[in-house]
């Protein structure tokens, strides 16, 4: 992951990439969001949780309909992008979308519950 991030930002290492990434913020943009916004982040993400919690707090402060879900090591899916359990991330996203659109999943023919 560090190699990829360094490559994306044109850095020779992760420290240089992190420095180049500092200007990339959603301040001044996020409050223009008109649709619900979901943030899923691994609680043990190598990039940390401080950035996403700050983004969440900023969105709430500016009236954005935002949901934050931090995954834990106990449920797996706590790594970056839920690499340790991608199914969990997919389930969280799709359940959230069902809630947003008012879909009662128990009425669906393929619902396993």
Regions found by a protein language model. Name each.
Residues 1-29:
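Mobile cap/lid helix-loop segments that gate and shape the active-site cleft of serine hydrolases
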């Amino acid at each position: 992951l560090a190699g990829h991030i360094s490559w994306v930002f044109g850095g020779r290492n992760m420290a240089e990439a992190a420095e180049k990434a500092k200007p990339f913020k959603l301040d001044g943009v996020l409050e223009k969001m008109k649709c619900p916004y979901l943030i899923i982040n691994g609680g043990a993400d190598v990039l940390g949780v401080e950035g996403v919690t700050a983004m969440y707090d900023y969105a709430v402060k500016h009236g954005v309909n935002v949901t934050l879900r931090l995954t834990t090591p106990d449920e797996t899916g706590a790594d970056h992008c839920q690499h340790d359990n991608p199914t969990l991330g997919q389930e969280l996203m799709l359940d959230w979308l069902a809630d947003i659109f008012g879909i009662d999943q128990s009425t669906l023919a393929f619902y396993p519950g």
